[in-house]
Design a protein with these regions (language model features):
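Short beta-strand micro-motifs enriched in acidic
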Residues: 73-77, 85, 94-98
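Short, mixed charged/polar active-site loops
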Residues: 90-92, 118
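Eukaryotic low-complexity, non-globular regulatory regions
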Residues: 1-71, 77, 101-148
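Long, acidic/polar E/Q/S-rich protein-interaction regions used at subunit-assembly interfaces
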Residues: 88-90, 101
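A preference for well-ordered globular domain cores
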Residues: 86-88, 107
């Protein structure tokens, strides 16, 4: 049994928070991609990268209930983008397994909709920004009139 199946990604129903159920459904879908999914030369996202994405999101949203799941977007090169677009802001966190170590490479771009400020970073700086901003942009906003 793969680690994804052990996490409940195989399709088995578990008592999970809404955001985690949505995240794991997205992971399940991506785990089924085959070579050539995005045209000649495209490669599927490896299981280890999907597991890293789940780890990053779970770590950032730990203890939070009223949040939305990010969208996981595959790259044709086997990379993965974790993204949120919300009233509060945007994050596009790119991860791949092409680096020199087990962590691969990570980078982030984001925008705070309240201030209009944009931010970006790579490596450890990107991880720190992701941990800081993921809980902010993932929070469900009940007030649709929340100013930007």
């Amino acid at each position: 049994m793969s680690e994804l199946e052990e996490m409940g990604v195989s399709g088995a129903e578990h008592e999970l928070s809404d955001w985690k159920s949505v995240l794991l459904a997205n992971v399940r879908s991506l785990s089924e991609l085959n070579a050539g999914w995005d045209g000649p030369g495209s490669v599927p996202v490896r299981e280890t990268l999907l597991l890293r994405a789940v780890f990053y999101v779970e770590s950032a949203l730990s203890g939070l209930a009223d949040v939305t799941a990010p969208r996981l977007v595959p790259g044709g090169d086997g990379s993965l983008q974790i993204e949120w677009h919300s009233v509060r802001g945007e994050i596009e966190f790119d991860i791949d397994d092409q680096g020199q170590d087990d962590q691969g490479q990570v980078s982030i771009w984001g925008r705070d909709h309240l201030s209009g400020e944009e931010f970006d970073g790579e490596g450890e700086a990107a991880l720190a920004l992701f941990r800081q901003w993921a809980p902010v942009v993932a929070v469900r906003h009940r007030d649709a009139g929340l100013s930007k």
